[in-house]
Amino acid sequence: MSMLCYTLIIAFLIGIWAAPQSEDNVPLGSPATSDLSDTSCAQTHEGLKTSRNTDQRHPAPKKVDDQEPGSVANIIVDPKLFQKRQFQSSRVLFSTQPPPLSRDEQSVEFLNNEDALNRNIQAKRQNHPVHDLGEHSVCDSISEWVTKTTATDIKGNTVTVEVDVNLNNEVYKQYFFETKCRNPNPVPSGCRGIDSRLWNSYCTTTQTFVKALTMEGNQASWRFIRIDTACVCVITKKTDNL
């Protein structure tokens, strides 16, 4: 009888030793706990992969701030920057589309309240009365609204000029009204109406400085840049007549 009891006890102990330990009885830091952590990490990683795949199938719309550099065609400008704008020129204009060159063109949306003044100036430049009176200009010029990506500032440095500006979720372009010579020699002798027997002459484009929105590092700032503004006649006295 005692042998049978010993046999049963030994079999019971062997069974307990051979049975896998339950997770509830595993001490902290044991291999079973490590396996459980690995399992949880694997499940979490699998969940992240599933979520990432779902996001790839249904990508969320990008915000302006989240887009890669170079993928955004315009910069977002603080409206306070325009409140600090000084020395405004009628030759610099922020508009949603190319400004009209004549009074008959359809009106467009301007950034400031000087649209009427700008349109009047444009009309006067386009419809100058001298040709209607039989008068002729010494030099022929052409005027048009243009955009710029680079320019020379007042210090002689090449700077980056902003083309597209995002202000209050509205995209404006920065336009410059430039005037330049159509031809350096409107007549074979140079400038029109100049006595070529006494004078050498030619037409040349002159420039002036206007305040424009430029990029300085990663910030937008106002800076004086040079643009073409007029076509003038340059004359020099012929040396053989001295």
UniProtKB/Swiss-Prot annotation:
Lineage: superkingdom: Eukaryota
Localization of this protein: Secreted
Disulfide-linked positions: C139-C203, C181-C231, C191-C233
GO biological process entries: cell surface receptor protein tyrosine kinase signaling pathway; modulation of chemical synaptic transmission; negative regulation of neuron apoptotic process; nerve development; nerve growth factor signaling pathway; neuron projection morphogenesis
Position of the signal peptide: 1-18
A Pfam family of this chain: NGF
Annotated tissue distribution: Expressed by the venom gland.
InterPro entries: Cystine-knot_cytokine (IPR029034), Nerve_growth_factor-like (IPR020408), Nerve_growth_factor-rel (IPR002072), Nerve_growth_factor_bsu (IPR020425), Nerve_growth_factor_CS (IPR019846), Venom_nerve_growth_factor (IPR020433)
Entry GO CC: axon; dendrite; extracellular space; synaptic vesicle
Keyword Membrane listed: no
Alphabetized GO MF terms: growth factor activity; lipid binding; metalloendopeptidase inhibitor activity; nerve growth factor receptor binding; toxin activity
Region described as Disordered: spans on this chain: 45-69
Keyword terms: Cleavage on pair of basic residues, Disulfide bond, Growth factor, Lipid-binding, Metalloenzyme inhibitor, Metalloprotease inhibitor, Protease inhibitor, Secreted, Signal, Toxin
SMART domains on file: NGF
Residue positions assigned to the propeptide: 19-125
Biased segments, Basic and acidic residues type: 46-66
Function recorded in the entry: Nerve growth factor is important for the development and maintenance of the sympathetic and sensory nervous systems. It stimulates division and differentiation of sympathetic and embryonic sensory neurons as well as basal forebrain cholinergic neurons in the brain. Its relevance in the snake venom is not clear. However, it has been shown to inhibit metalloproteinase-dependent proteolysis of platelet glycoprotein Ib alpha, suggesting a metalloproteinase inhibition to prevent metalloprotease autodigestion and/or protection against prey proteases.
Assembly description: Homodimer; non-covalently linked.
Name under which the protein is recorded: Venom nerve growth factor 3
Organism classification: Eukaryota, Metazoa, Chordata, Craniata, Vertebrata
